[in-house]
């Protein structure tokens, strides 16, 4: 029997209708796997070993009573076959410390999804720079002069922090916006932090598409997150509306270009954000939208694809 651990935000406060981590747990349990639950505060390192307080977990599709805990254990993480790192951003120093603890388990044979080193290496905003032919024109800088010049070149730009999620602190700045200076000051904290600028993509009105890639294989359906009236952000957390649809030709092209590199880096479950035919983000920490896509296209099991990939990788380790 496969022992699966998960590191996540408190399961007591999730929305099971939309939570991707919960969908993963349901599928793992359906396969008879043993579930071990952890939060960030349960992880620790002793004598060079990653360890944790874990609780045995049962889950069920019941909006009033979706989980129960069993026995509590204190164990070395290498006792688990696989660990899903599903802690939501912020990607801060605490998150980085957790990846080092998980990496000690990986060094002793545990499969960690996603690979701890790659979680550190592949910043969700910056990793797109490795694929400049697929992205909008992009500037990363602390300098107000650089950002102003970029704004003059394009006239209509998006400014965002490098560590945000869910559409927080994303600004659209048009040609004669009187707030440009204060937005730059706010995002860069008076030129002390890097931020990202990209040319505005009018195709956002058709949706910001979340394309999932599982162990190098693009899922054939995506979730287009369509901005609310008067908004430029499609994120569901910012009031966007989700619409599942098949991948377009350009979605396939982008996903197939990026997928082999993701697989090679041990990034087994990844969410690409695509606007029109441009790649805007590569989400590696805790990608979502599985529930919405599976609800619209029941013939696809994304969590099934993931658990199959985990089984394959575990079999390869033993071979």
Curated annotation (Swiss-Prot):
Alphabetical list of SUPFAM superfamilies matching this protein: Glutathione synthetase ATP-binding domain-like (SSF56059), PreATP-grasp domain (SSF52440)
Alphabetical UniProt keywords: ATP-binding, Glutathione biosynthesis, Ligase, Magnesium, Manganese, Metal-binding, Nucleotide-binding
Pfam entry (one): GSH-S_ATP
Enzyme Commission number, as recorded: 6.3.2.3
Catalytic activity entry: gamma-L-glutamyl-L-cysteine + glycine + ATP = glutathione + ADP + phosphate + H(+)
UniProt domain ATP-grasp: residue ranges: 125-311
InterPro entries linked: ATP-grasp, ATP_grasp_subdomain_1, Glut_synth_pro, GSHS_ATP-bd, GSHS_N, PreATP-grasp_dom_sf
Entry keyword annotation includes Protein transport: no
Residues bound to ATP: 151-207
Top-level taxon in the UniProt lineage: Bacteria
Signal peptide: none
Residues noted as binding Mg(2+) in the record, renumbered to the chain: 281, 283
Cofactor: Mg(2+); Mn(2+)
One MF annotation (Gene Ontology) recorded for this entry: glutathione synthase activity
Cofactor note: Binds 1 Mg(2+) or Mn(2+) ion per subunit.
Gene3D superfamilies for this protein: 3.40.50.20, ATP-grasp fold, A domain, ATP-grasp fold, B domain
GO cellular component, one term: cytoplasm
Biological or metabolic pathway of the protein: Sulfur metabolism; glutathione biosynthesis; glutathione from L-cysteine and L-glutamate: step 2/2
Main enzyme class: ligase
NCBIfam families the record matches: glut_syn (TIGR01380), PRK05246.1 (NF003573)
UniProt similarity note: Belongs to the prokaryotic GSH synthase family.
PANTHER family, per the entry: GLUTATHIONE SYNTHETASE (PTHR21621:SF4), RIBOSOMAL PROTEIN S6 MODIFICATION PROTEIN (PTHR21621)
HAMAP family membership: GSH_S
Protein name per its UniProtKB record: Glutathione synthetase
Species assigned in the record: Yersinia pestis
The organism's taxonomic lineage, starting at the top: Bacteria, Pseudomonadati, Pseudomonadota, Gammaproteobacteria, Enterobacterales
């Amino acid at each position: 029997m496969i022992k699966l651990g998960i590191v996540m935000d408190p399961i007591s406060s999730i929305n099971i209708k939309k939570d991707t981590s919960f969908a993963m747990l349901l599928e793992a349990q359906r396969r008879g796997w043993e579930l071990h639950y952890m939060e960030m505060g349960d992880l620790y390192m002793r004598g060079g070993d990653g360890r944790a307080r874990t609780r045995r977990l049962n889950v069920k599709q019941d909006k009033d009573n979706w989980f129960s805990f069993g026995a509590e254990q204190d164990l070395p993480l290498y006792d688990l076959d696989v660990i899903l790192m599903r802690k939501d951003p912020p990607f801060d120093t605490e998150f980085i410390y957790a990846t080092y603890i998980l990496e000690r388990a990986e060094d002793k044979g545990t499969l960690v999804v996603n690979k701890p080193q790659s979680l550190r290496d592949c910043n969700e905003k910056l990793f797109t720079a490795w694929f400049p032919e697929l992205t909008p024109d992009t500037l990363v800088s602390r300098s107000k002069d650089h950002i102003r010049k970029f704004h003059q070149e394009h006239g209509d730009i998006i400014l965002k922090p490098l560590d945000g999620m869910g559409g927080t602190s994303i600004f659209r700045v048009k040609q004669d916006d009187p707030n440009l200076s204060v937005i730059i000051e706010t995002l860069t904290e008076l030129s002390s932090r890097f931020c990202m600028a990209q040319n505005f993509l009018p195709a956002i009105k058709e949706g910001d598409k979340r394309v999932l890639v599982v162990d190098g294989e693009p899922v054939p359906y995506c979730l287009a997150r369509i901005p609310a009236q008067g908004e430029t952000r499609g994120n569901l957390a910012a009031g966007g509306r989700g619409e599942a649809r098949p991948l377009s030709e350009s979605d396939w092209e982008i996903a197939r270009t990026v997928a082999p590199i993701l697989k090679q880096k041990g990034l087994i479950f990844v969410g690409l954000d695509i606007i029109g035919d441009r790649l805007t983000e590569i989400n590696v920490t805790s990608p979502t939208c599985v529930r919405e896509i599976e609800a619209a296209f029941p013939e696809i099991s994304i969590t099934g694809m993931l658990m199959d990939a985990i089984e394959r990788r575990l079999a390869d380790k033993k071979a």
